[in-house]
Amino acid sequence: ADSVVTGNWGADASLLVKASDEAGLPVDFYTYYGGFVGVPASIGEAGIGRLKQVTGFHANVGLGADELIEGYRSRFPQSNDDLYWLTLLYAMEMLVQAIEQNQSTDPLLIAKAMEGGTFEGPIGDVWIREDNHQLLQPIYVSTLARLGEEGVKYDVERTGMGFKTDGRIEAIDTVLPTTCQMDRPD
């Protein structure tokens, strides 16, 4: 095998990558949590070129993300964490849209308004599927690399390492049929 797909994060991810590095095991690690707080710092150099993440966002995606990253870092200059969960921005913006559309905070009206709701995000359009309430957004595959390498403008956790985009999957390309039979209130 040349790759390991793992759900490990935190200390478990760090120990896994470091142990494979020490053992000379030449594999890449694909994870959803590779950029989660503490993971890049604890893995360190052992993750360069080998730690890959599949996420909805990372600091070096470009497009409209630079403004968000710069704003976050200027507001929290002493923080070693990073803007990671862009889905929180989407959720809040779409909630505001639903409230404004209905001029109400009634949960049922808001839920109905959010079904099929769209938001023009800083890195592309996102929307909520009506049939199962999934948020659909672009997905990125990225690899941990050294700050300053092509495509790595921002480091994570001020480590001198950041994620470089390997590929982007458009939201529409992630849509699969669903068997969801959601019961909705009247």
Annotate each language-model stretch with its function.
Residues 118, 122-186:
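Solvent-exposed, acidic/polar segments of extracytosolic/periplasmic ligand-binding ectodomains
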Residues 6-10, 32-35, 54-58, 132, ...:
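Active-site-proximal beta-strand/loop segments in catalytic clefts of secreted hydrolases
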Residues 106-123:
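Short, well-structured alpha-helical segments that form the helix of a local strand-helix-strand
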